[in-house]
UniProtKB/Swiss-Prot annotation:
Residues 194-209, 233-247 have a biased composition (Low complexity). The lineage of its organism: Eukaryota, Metazoa, Ecdysozoa, Nematoda, Chromadorea. Belongs to the even-skipped homeobox family. This is Homeobox protein vab-7. It comes from Caenorhabditis elegans. It is found in: Nucleus. InterPro entries: Even-skipped_HD (IPR052002), HD (IPR001356), Homeobox_CS (IPR017970), Homeodomain-like_sf (IPR009057). Residues 68-127 bind DNA.
Length: 247
């Protein structure tokens, strides 16, 4: 027959030791994350989706994708004609005039403002190029060359210098008579380098045609004097009496 002591019968709780308390605390601290990771996969998926959504939408970018797209406005012929006439009057339109044009042409004021900005830039490019629009066919073909603009400016400057020089030609005294208009109509000049006749003219100083003629006349007169025989009959020594004469 099994015997029981008084403590087991009364049911006095046993006080846990220090080792048991530390082991229990460690088990309670490590078990919840492990159980949550293996038994709650939807929470991890939801957290990843939220992080991806936060990275896709910038907090300072409130614009939609449709607002970021810009479409080119197709102007009608009447609208372009009206805008061109207004641009001929004044390059910079006031807000009042812009509002009147917007109401007349059924266009937004922002579109009219952008059109005038682009038109001013186009006019500035034409003024810098120094050419009237539209270009002649030869000049248009010449301007297709990447280096054509620089070469055309150099040729035009050299031709203007030669036209005011003593030779009255396009390039001075070299005998060439190319005018600025003819120089601009040469669409296939070499893109690199500088014309050889221009470099030759830059090293030579322009000389006056009168000086050349005078030097030539001096040379010819000296040659004639050397080749002409000396006539002693008309010299003053022959007409004077000789000191040894007996008369």
């Amino acid at each position: 027959m099994q015997s029981f002591d008084i403590e087991s019968l009364i049911g006095v709780n046993k006080v846990p030791s220090l080792v048991e308390m530390v082991a229990a605390s460690r088990a309670s601290s490590f078990s919840p994350p492990f159980e949550q990771q293996h038994h709650d996969p939807m929470g991890v998926v939801a957290a990843a989706a939220a992080a991806a959504a936060a990275g896709r939408h910038h907090p300072y970018d409130n614009r939609d994708d449709g607002q970021m797209r810009r479409y080119r406005t197709a102007f009608s012929r009447e609208q372009i004609g009206r805008l061109e006439r207004e641009f001929a009057k004044e390059n910079y339109v006031s807000r009042k005039t812009r509002g009147e044009l917007a109401a007349e042409l059924n266009l937004p004021e922002g579109t009219i403002k952008v059109w005038f900005q682009n038109r001013r830039m186009k006019d500035k490019r034409q003024r810098v190029g120094g050419l009237a629009w539209p270009f002649p066919p030869q000049m248009a073909a010449y301007m297709l060359n990447p280096f054509a603009y620089e070469m055309w400016m150099k040729t035009a400057a050299a031709s203007q210098f030669g036209a005011t020089g003593p030779g009255n030609g396009a390039y001075g005294n070299n005998g060439s008579s190319t005018s600025p208009s003819a120089a601009g109509s040469l669409p296939f000049l070499p893109p690199l380098g500088f014309p050889s006749f221009l470099s030759q003219n830059s090293t030579k100083s322009p000389s006056s045609p009168h000086s050349d003629d005078s030097s030539k006349s001096k040379n010819t007169s000296s040659d004639d004097d050397e080749s002409k025989p000396v006539n002693f009959s008309n010299s003053p020594s022959s007409s004077s009496p000789s000191p040894y004469s007996t008369d």
